[in-house]
Amino acid sequence: TKPYLASRFNISAMSYGSLSKTAIEALNWGAKIGDFFHNTGEGGISPYHIKHGGDLCWQIGTGYFGCRNNDGTFNREMYKASSQQDQVKLIELKISQGAKPGHGGMLPGSKVDEEIAKIRAVEIGKDVNSPPKHSAFNGPKGLINFVQELRELSGGKPVGFKLCIGSKHEFFAICKAMLELKVY
């Protein structure tokens, strides 16, 4: 395993595209100087995230940007190659977020230029959907098994998940799966 001791101060998830290259570079430079991590957001790892050498938390959402097949499903080989970069210190699997629990998203094709297409592994000029749920797994046990697979493919880096839940039952089901599968 490759444990990572995170600072109490880190940079929250914000994708390149939502923020400019200058903003991403400045945030990553700050992470390098401050010795804390910079979360990429679900848009993938851009050259601007790695330019200054700050530690990265690579966030992977339902669109699997930067590690997807043409049909939008998870691509293990692309994930393995990106996750094993030295600068990527940990991985965050985004299940849902408070602003839009249970909803996907859509990036209009007009915003998918050559650079965005390359970073996200999508087609230039085409609308890109982020489904409301992951296609790589189903249910709590599927989630925990997928987390373990991501950990193994990354060479033992820490893998966590981000979620917004509507009931305690959902959270307890994930905890039960972790205990049953002995994946922590």
PLM features per residue range, with description:
Residues 1-184:
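Active-site entrance/lid segments in N-terminal catalytic domains of soluble metabolic enzymes
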